[in-house]
Regions:
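Active-site-proximal acidic segments at structured loop/helix or strand boundaries
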Residues: 80
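Hydrophobic alpha-helical transmembrane segments
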Residues: 2-75, 83, 87-89, 95, ...
């Protein structure tokens, strides 16, 4: 592997490429749309319920982890589809594993959300 010199221009381009990836994720991936819709609801609810700094940290980390995992999953699926457009059992397992990782993070994020939001919602009725 070639050692390249540090270049500000290259660093700027890397952010540009990453930004394009984020735009592609939220504009073309249906599952990411769902995650974004939930994100908006959670942020609004958090603002209305007055989350603490640490609660916001947990929420933001969960949101970021799920969206990042969805991005990696989408990239793996796109690469698998390009490499093997026809059905392949190994490709199926690879895609299932990537999707499973997103599911695990999403479920854990729901649990974190329940731990944070349920007590706050219940306190509104007491």
């Amino acid at each position: 592997m070639e050692n390249k010199r540090f270049s500000i221009k290259d660093r700027i381009y890397s952010f540009k490429y990453a930004g394009r990836g984020v735009v592609r994720l939220v504009s073309r991936e249906h599952n990411a749309w769902r995650h974004c819709a939930v994100t908006v609801c959670v942020i609004v609810a958090g603002g209305l319920l007055g989350l603490s700094t640490f609660e916001w940290i947990a929420v933001v980390l969960c949101i970021g982890a799920v969206l990042a995992a969805e991005g990696v999953n989408s990239a793996i699926e796109a690469l698998c589809d390009k490499v093997s457009p026809e059905y392949d059992e190994a490709i199926k397992h690879t895609k299932d594993l990537a999707a499973g990782a997103v599911l695990i993070l999403a479920v854990m994020s729901v649990i974190v959300g329940l731990l944070i939001f349920v007590p706050k919602i219940l306190s509104l009725f007491h």
